[in-house]
């Protein structure tokens, strides 16, 4: 059942969409110490992510119309996953802020693209489950980061775990392109 596969992927994508949103609050004290930045630097990071999110949300309709929802979801998950992993590799705070913008670009396209797709193809009831899936993701993000900090002694490993999950999801979307376009 191709539609069932798409529904499951959509739910997993919204879980993955919520995860990064739940990581930063728990990781922030460690990130701040790592980069030796002031407390208010978090505002720059959040603003960058929000800016990317708003831009891609606003442009997602024409982009999906041109490239198709499957390609946009695959590319957006890859962008978000690469950004999350990139957070762990950058040597300076400004680069992490820039990656926050890129991550926001990916997240905004996933959110608006999937919302539109599910509303058009599955209906209102599935929209409720889609948003419940986001709740699972945003709830699991702090658990993942707490585990990374307490058992692995690194905020970076929390972002790597979620980034790898996003990259895996990008491969899932890429491998189901033909199903998304029908």
Name every feature range the model reports, one short phrase each:
Residues 5-37, 57:
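Extracytoplasmic
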Residues 71-86, 94:
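Structural signature of the two symmetry-related core transmembrane helices
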Residues 56-69, 149:
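Helix-to-loop junctions at the C-terminal end of transmembrane segments
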Residues 22, 49-58, 139:
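Residue-level signature of mid-helix packing/kink "hotspots" within the transmembrane helices
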Residues 99-134:
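Cytoplasmic helix-loop-helix junction between adjacent transmembrane helices
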Residues 9-10, 92-100:
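Short hydrophobic/alpha-helical segments at membrane-entry points of transmembrane helices
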Residues 36, 68, 89-94:
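Helix-breaking motifs and short loop linkers at transmembrane-helix boundaries and internal kinks
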Residues 157-175:
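Symmetry-related core transmembrane helices of the 12-TM Major Facilitator Superfamily/SLC fold
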